[in-house]
């Protein structure tokens, strides 16, 4: 079939398998160009490995460190009539390129919150790798089905206390609007922590540990975003921030557990990037369009891949073997360049000046839209979008 982008809200409902494969290819090339990562882990599990930072982690581990990788994700395969999800095609492309390099790659597709996912992963590690040296936890799911009860819990992207009103961009109409978001109820806050907090990360590490599949010195990392006062009302000070604070709580508990065998657990605070997750958060697209332009001008812009490469090579697995620098909460900070005072001041000054008319001149909004479409495999250089493509792409993946 010939596949064109179809946008609904902040989701593109179609995906392009060849475009997704080309994206992965580019990320691999970027990783290889950096040269091998010294002291890199050799057996890596990535929970949430099909897009964004999770995919970048798997690519970095495999193509920067030569690691055997297991990826866990929840994606849909394409059919004769309908394309699959971008994450399916990303994972298929990763698997193809890893195997071409002679790297071990296996994937599990299903609900990572489930007990079955954890058990199947443990069985696979025991069978193929024995143990693992690194666990990356990178789930970005809006819902969680509780394994014991089957109850489905939903998260909320809402402020706490009062209605939040701010200048935002309507990405469908390319227009500046006033966005208002009602505050979360106590139950919504609690539910957001249940879905997006640290509990499931703990359940994963505890299950892996009890099964004896964590090697001595195993490191685990989960991803977070803090941002600045421009996004705090909806993010860090909102329901989502409560969940991210719960990740910090989990990291402390897990670090204590793993330190007994020479391991570590850290939250890595990353910069804002264009992902399906961030596009759903009010004000984030406008903020990203602003901050990207300034960071590009300053020569410090990074995408997912550059961020994770820096986390591996300059934080967790440094060439000299020294411990990673952390902040007062034991977090790895990769948002340091974004949070530079000159960059943030620029955004603060610019925010009130942006109008629908000057949006494309004052910010990198055009690039934001391009990056967004690229997530789904569209607008990628070197891809013929008028060519007939097969939406059915198979690879080495087992259903959970």
From Swiss-Prot:
Residues that hold NAD(+) according to the record: 48-53, 74-75, 111-112, 139-140, 244, 273-275
InterPro entries: Eno_Rdtase_FAD-bd_dom, Enoyl-CoA_Rdtase_cat_dom, FabV-like_NADH_b, Trans-2-enoyl-CoA_reductase
Site entry (Plays an important role in discriminating NADH against NADPH), positions: 75
Keyword Signal: no
Gene Ontology molecular functions: enoyl-[acyl-carrier-protein] reductase (NADH) activity; NAD binding; trans-2-enoyl-CoA reductase (NADH) activity
Binding site residues for substrate: 225
Coiled-coil parts of chain: none
One Pfam match: Eno-Rase_FAD_bd
Keyword list, A-Z: Fatty acid biosynthesis, Fatty acid metabolism, Lipid biosynthesis, Lipid metabolism, NAD, Oxidoreductase
Gene Ontology biological-process annotations: fatty acid biosynthetic process
Root EC class: oxidoreductase
Active site, UniProt feature: 235 (proton donor)
Pathway(s) this gene product operates in, as recorded in its UniProt entry: Lipid metabolism; fatty acid biosynthesis
Functional summary from the UniProt entry: Involved in the final reduction of the elongation cycle of fatty acid synthesis (FAS II). Catalyzes the reduction of a carbon-carbon double bond in an enoyl moiety that is covalently linked to an acyl carrier protein (ACP).
Subunit structure: Monomer.
Protein family (similarity comment): Belongs to the TER reductase family.
Protein name per its UniProtKB record: Enoyl-[acyl-carrier-protein] reductase [NADH]
Species name: Aliivibrio fischeri (strain ATCC 700601 / ES114)
């Amino acid at each position: 079939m010939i596949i064109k982008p179809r946008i609904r809200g902040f989701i593109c409902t179609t995906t392009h398998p060849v475009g997704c494969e080309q994206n992965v290819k580019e990320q691999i090339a970027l990783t290889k160009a950096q040269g091998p990562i010294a002291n890199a882990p050799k057996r890596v599990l990535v929970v949430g490995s099909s897009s964004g930072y999770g995919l970048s982690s798997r690519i970095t581990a495999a193509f920067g460190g030569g690691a055997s990788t297991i990826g866990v994700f929840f994606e849909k395969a394409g059919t004769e009539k309908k394309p699959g999800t971008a994450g399916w095609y990303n994972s298929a492309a990763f698997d193809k390129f890893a195997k071409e390099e002679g790297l071990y790659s296996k994937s599990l597709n299903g609900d990572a919150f489930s007990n079955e996912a954890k058990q199947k992963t443990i069985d696979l590690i025991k069978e193929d790798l024995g143990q693992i040296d690194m666990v990356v936890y990178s789930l970005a799911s809006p819902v969680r089905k509780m394994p014991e009860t089957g109850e489905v819990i939903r998260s909320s992207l809402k402020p706490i206390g009062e209605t939040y009103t701010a200048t935002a961009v309507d990405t469908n109409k390319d227009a500046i609007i006033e966005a208002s978001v009602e505050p979360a109820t106590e139950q919504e806050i609690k539910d957001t922590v249940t879905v997006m907090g640290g509990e499931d990360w703990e359940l994963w590490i505890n299950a892996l540990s009890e099964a004896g599949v964590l090697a001595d010195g195993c490191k685990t990392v989960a991803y977070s975003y803090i941002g600045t006062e421009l996004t705090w009302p909806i993010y860090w000070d909102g329901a989502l921030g409560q969940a991210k604070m719960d990740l910090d709580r989990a990291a402390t508990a897990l670090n204590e557990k793993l330190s007994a065998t020479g391991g570590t657990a850290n939250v890595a605070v990353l910069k804002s990037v264009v992902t399906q997750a961030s596009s759903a958060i009010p004000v984030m697209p406008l903020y990203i369009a602003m901050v990207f332009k300034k960071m590009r001008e300053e020569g410090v812009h990074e995408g997912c891949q550059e961020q994770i490469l820096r986390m591996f090579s300059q934080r967790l697995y440094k060439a000299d073997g020294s411990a990673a620098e952390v902040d007062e909460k034991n977090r790895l900070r990769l948002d340091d360049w974004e949070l530079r005072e000159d960059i943030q001041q620029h955004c603060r000054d610019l925010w009130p000046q942006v109008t629908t008319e000057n949006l494309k001149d004052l910010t990198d909004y055009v690039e934001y839209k391009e990056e967004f479409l690229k997530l789904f495999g569209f607008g990628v250089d070197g891809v013929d979008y008028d060519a007939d493509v097969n939406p059915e792409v198979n690879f080495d993946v087992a259903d959970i």
